[in-house]
Protein backbone atom coordinates (compact mmCIF):
# COMPACT_ATOMS: atom_id res chain seq x y z
CA UNK A 1 0.00 0.00 0.00
CA UNK A 2 1.07 3.63 -0.42
CA UNK A 3 0.05 6.89 1.18
CA UNK A 4 -1.45 9.39 -1.26
CA UNK A 5 -3.00 12.82 -0.92
CA UNK A 6 -6.65 13.43 -1.72
CA UNK A 7 -6.83 15.70 -4.77
CA UNK A 8 -9.90 17.40 -3.31
CA UNK A 9 -7.98 18.55 -0.27
CA UNK A 10 -9.33 15.88 2.06
CA UNK A 11 -7.45 13.64 4.46
CA UNK A 12 -4.60 11.42 3.34
CA UNK A 13 -5.92 8.06 2.19
CA UNK A 14 -4.55 4.58 1.73
CA UNK A 15 -4.65 3.38 -1.89
CA UNK A 16 -4.59 -0.22 -3.04
CA UNK A 17 -1.47 -1.83 -4.50
CA UNK A 18 -1.17 -0.89 -8.21
CA UNK A 19 -1.18 -3.65 -10.80
CA UNK A 20 1.92 -4.59 -12.78
CA UNK A 21 0.31 -3.13 -15.89
CA UNK A 22 -0.18 0.23 -14.17
CA UNK A 23 3.40 0.22 -12.91
CA UNK A 24 4.80 -0.43 -16.40
CA UNK A 25 2.58 2.29 -17.85
CA UNK A 26 3.77 4.76 -15.19
CA UNK A 27 7.45 3.92 -15.81
CA UNK A 28 6.99 4.42 -19.56
CA UNK A 29 5.37 7.80 -18.99
CA UNK A 30 8.13 8.96 -16.61
CA UNK A 31 10.88 7.80 -18.97
CA UNK A 32 9.31 9.81 -21.77
CA UNK A 33 8.86 13.01 -19.79
CA UNK A 34 11.45 13.12 -17.04
CA UNK A 35 14.60 11.68 -18.61
CA UNK A 36 17.22 13.82 -20.30
CA UNK A 37 17.00 13.50 -24.11
CA UNK A 38 20.16 12.57 -26.00
CA UNK A 39 20.58 16.07 -27.42
CA UNK A 40 20.52 17.58 -23.91
CA UNK A 41 17.99 19.79 -22.18
CA UNK A 42 14.54 19.12 -20.77
CA UNK A 43 10.99 19.58 -21.91
CA UNK A 44 10.34 22.18 -19.24
CA UNK A 45 6.55 22.05 -19.43
CA UNK A 46 6.64 18.31 -18.77
CA UNK A 47 9.31 18.19 -16.07
CA UNK A 48 8.73 18.67 -12.33
CA UNK A 49 10.15 21.87 -10.87
CA UNK A 50 12.80 20.07 -8.81
CA UNK A 51 14.17 18.31 -11.90
CA UNK A 52 14.36 21.60 -13.80
CA UNK A 53 16.43 23.07 -10.98
CA UNK A 54 18.61 20.00 -10.71
CA UNK A 55 19.67 20.15 -14.35
CA UNK A 56 19.56 23.87 -15.03
CA UNK A 57 22.69 25.29 -16.61
CA UNK A 58 24.36 28.04 -14.58
CA UNK A 59 27.04 29.98 -16.44
CA UNK A 60 30.31 29.07 -14.73
CA UNK A 61 33.91 30.14 -15.29
CA UNK A 62 36.74 27.83 -14.22
CA UNK A 63 40.28 29.19 -13.86
CA UNK A 64 43.69 27.55 -13.72
CA UNK A 65 44.43 29.05 -10.31
CA UNK A 66 43.10 31.33 -7.59
CA UNK A 67 45.00 34.36 -8.90
CA UNK A 68 43.24 34.34 -12.27
CA UNK A 69 39.85 33.92 -10.63
CA UNK A 70 40.54 36.74 -8.18
CA UNK A 71 41.54 39.08 -11.01
CA UNK A 72 38.31 38.40 -12.87
CA UNK A 73 36.07 38.96 -9.84
CA UNK A 74 38.00 42.07 -8.74
CA UNK A 75 37.69 43.53 -12.25
CA UNK A 76 33.92 43.10 -12.12
CA UNK A 77 33.60 44.64 -8.65
CA UNK A 78 35.70 47.68 -9.58
CA UNK A 79 33.77 48.11 -12.83
CA UNK A 80 30.39 47.89 -11.06
CA UNK A 81 31.34 50.47 -8.42
CA UNK A 82 32.75 52.87 -11.01
CA UNK A 83 29.64 52.64 -13.18
CA UNK A 84 27.42 53.23 -10.16
CA UNK A 85 29.44 56.29 -9.13
CA UNK A 86 29.29 57.73 -12.64
CA UNK A 87 25.51 57.60 -12.46
CA UNK A 88 25.00 58.76 -8.86
CA UNK A 89 27.92 61.13 -8.34
CA UNK A 90 28.99 64.41 -9.90
CA UNK A 91 32.01 66.61 -9.24
CA UNK A 92 33.21 64.05 -6.68
CA UNK A 93 30.25 64.88 -4.42
CA UNK A 94 28.76 61.53 -3.40
CA UNK A 95 25.13 60.79 -2.73
CA UNK A 96 25.98 59.19 0.60
CA UNK A 97 22.32 58.36 1.21
CA UNK A 98 22.49 56.00 -1.79
CA UNK A 99 25.82 54.18 -1.66
CA UNK A 100 26.70 51.17 -3.79
CA UNK A 101 25.76 48.11 -1.70
CA UNK A 102 28.30 45.28 -1.68
CA UNK A 103 27.51 41.99 0.04
CA UNK A 104 30.47 40.24 1.69
CA UNK A 105 30.93 36.57 2.39
CA UNK A 106 32.99 35.26 5.30
CA UNK A 107 35.51 32.44 5.63
CA UNK A 108 38.91 31.86 4.00
CA UNK A 109 37.80 31.61 0.37
CA UNK A 110 37.40 35.36 -0.37
CA UNK A 111 40.53 36.57 1.44
CA UNK A 112 42.61 36.66 -1.74
CA UNK A 113 39.92 38.78 -3.37
CA UNK A 114 39.79 41.18 -0.43
CA UNK A 115 43.57 41.63 -0.55
CA UNK A 116 43.38 42.36 -4.27
CA UNK A 117 40.70 45.02 -3.70
CA UNK A 118 42.89 46.62 -1.02
CA UNK A 119 45.81 46.63 -3.47
CA UNK A 120 43.74 48.32 -6.15
CA UNK A 121 42.47 50.87 -3.64
CA UNK A 122 46.04 51.76 -2.63
CA UNK A 123 46.95 52.09 -6.32
CA UNK A 124 44.14 54.62 -6.72
CA UNK A 125 42.00 52.44 -8.97
CA UNK A 126 38.95 52.43 -6.70
CA UNK A 127 37.45 54.26 -3.73
CA UNK A 128 35.03 52.70 -1.27
CA UNK A 129 33.81 55.99 0.18
CA UNK A 130 30.47 55.59 -1.58
CA UNK A 131 30.16 51.87 -0.81
CA UNK A 132 28.16 50.18 1.95
CA UNK A 133 28.90 46.57 2.89
CA UNK A 134 26.71 43.93 4.49
CA UNK A 135 28.21 40.73 5.84
CA UNK A 136 26.50 37.41 5.19
CA UNK A 137 26.72 35.74 8.60
CA UNK A 138 28.26 35.58 12.07
CA UNK A 139 28.69 33.16 14.92
CA UNK A 140 26.59 33.68 18.06
CA UNK A 141 27.35 34.74 20.70
CA UNK A 142 30.63 36.48 19.79
CA UNK A 143 32.20 39.88 19.22
CA UNK A 144 33.47 40.75 15.74
CA UNK A 145 36.82 41.73 17.30
CA UNK A 146 37.44 38.17 18.50
CA UNK A 147 39.65 36.05 16.25
CA UNK A 148 37.05 33.28 16.17
CA UNK A 149 34.49 35.68 14.68
CA UNK A 150 33.38 35.01 11.12
CA UNK A 151 34.03 38.71 10.39
CA UNK A 152 37.39 39.18 12.12
CA UNK A 153 39.35 38.53 8.92
CA UNK A 154 37.07 40.82 6.89
CA UNK A 155 38.18 43.69 9.11
CA UNK A 156 41.83 42.67 9.28
CA UNK A 157 42.27 41.88 5.59
CA UNK A 158 39.87 44.36 3.98
CA UNK A 159 37.83 46.97 5.82
CA UNK A 160 40.68 48.36 7.94
CA UNK A 161 42.68 49.18 4.80
CA UNK A 162 40.17 51.06 2.64
CA UNK A 163 38.39 54.43 2.83
CA UNK A 164 34.93 53.07 3.61
CA UNK A 165 32.85 55.15 6.02
CA UNK A 166 32.31 53.45 9.42
CA UNK A 167 28.55 54.00 9.22
CA UNK A 168 28.49 52.04 5.96
CA UNK A 169 29.87 48.86 7.53
CA UNK A 170 27.11 46.45 8.53
CA UNK A 171 28.09 43.26 10.35
CA UNK A 172 25.61 40.96 12.16
CA UNK A 173 25.94 41.76 15.87
CA UNK A 174 26.82 38.61 17.79
CA UNK A 175 26.42 40.36 21.15
CA UNK A 176 22.67 41.00 20.96
CA UNK A 177 20.81 39.50 23.97
CA UNK A 178 19.20 36.20 23.02
CA UNK A 179 15.69 37.44 23.75
CA UNK A 180 16.19 40.20 21.16
CA UNK A 181 17.80 38.16 18.40
CA UNK A 182 14.63 37.76 16.32
CA UNK A 183 13.89 41.48 16.52
CA UNK A 184 17.48 42.32 15.60
CA UNK A 185 17.47 39.92 12.63
CA UNK A 186 14.33 41.55 11.27
CA UNK A 187 15.88 45.00 11.56
CA UNK A 188 19.05 43.76 9.81
CA UNK A 189 16.98 42.48 6.90
CA UNK A 190 15.09 45.78 6.74
CA UNK A 191 18.31 47.81 6.69
CA UNK A 192 19.68 45.95 3.68
CA UNK A 193 16.87 46.95 1.29
CA UNK A 194 18.94 45.93 -1.72
CA UNK A 195 22.27 44.36 -2.72
CA UNK A 196 23.92 45.72 -5.87
CA UNK A 197 26.59 43.03 -5.98
CA UNK A 198 27.07 39.99 -3.74
CA UNK A 199 30.32 38.14 -3.10
CA UNK A 200 29.18 34.67 -2.14
CA UNK A 201 30.85 31.42 -1.16
CA UNK A 202 29.40 27.94 -1.44
CA UNK A 203 30.40 25.25 1.07
CA UNK A 204 31.35 21.67 0.30
CA UNK A 205 27.78 20.52 0.93
CA UNK A 206 26.26 23.41 -1.02
CA UNK A 207 25.51 25.55 2.02
CA UNK A 208 25.41 29.35 1.74
CA UNK A 209 25.73 31.40 4.91
CA UNK A 210 24.68 28.51 7.20
CA UNK A 211 21.73 27.83 4.89
CA UNK A 212 22.07 24.10 4.32
CA UNK A 213 20.64 22.44 1.18
CA UNK A 214 16.88 22.33 1.57
CA UNK A 215 16.60 25.75 3.23
CA UNK A 216 13.79 27.95 1.97
CA UNK A 217 14.84 30.36 -0.78
CA UNK A 218 12.84 33.12 0.94
CA UNK A 219 14.23 32.52 4.41
CA UNK A 220 15.27 35.54 6.46
CA UNK A 221 18.17 36.40 8.75
CA UNK A 222 17.76 34.14 11.77
CA UNK A 223 19.53 32.17 14.48
CA UNK A 224 20.36 28.63 13.34
What are these model-derived regions, one by one?
Residues 22-101, 178:
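N-terminal glycine-/serine-/threonine-rich phosphate-binding loop
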Residues 113-115, 145, 209-211:
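Short glycine-/acidic-enriched loop or helix-start segments at secondary-structure transitions
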Residues 209-224:
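Class I SAM-dependent methyltransferase SAM-binding "motif I" and its flanking Rossmann-like core
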Residues 74-86, 118, 122, 155-159, ...:
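Generic structural signal for well-ordered alpha-helical scaffold segments
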Residues 86-123:
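Glycine-rich N-terminal segment of FAD-binding domains in flavoprotein oxidoreductases
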Residues 108-109, 139, 204-207, 213:
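Short glycine-rich anion-binding loops that position phosphate/pyrophosphate groups of nucleotides
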Residues 42-57, 126-199:
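Ligand-binding beta-strand-loop-alpha-helix segment within the catalytic cores
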Amino acid sequence: VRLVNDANGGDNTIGSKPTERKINKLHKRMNNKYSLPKDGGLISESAPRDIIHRYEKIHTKVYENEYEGVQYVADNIVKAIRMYNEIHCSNEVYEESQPFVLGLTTGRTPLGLYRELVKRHHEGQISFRNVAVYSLDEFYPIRSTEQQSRNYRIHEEFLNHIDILPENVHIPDGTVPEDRVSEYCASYDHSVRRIDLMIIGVGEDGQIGFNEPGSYSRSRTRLV
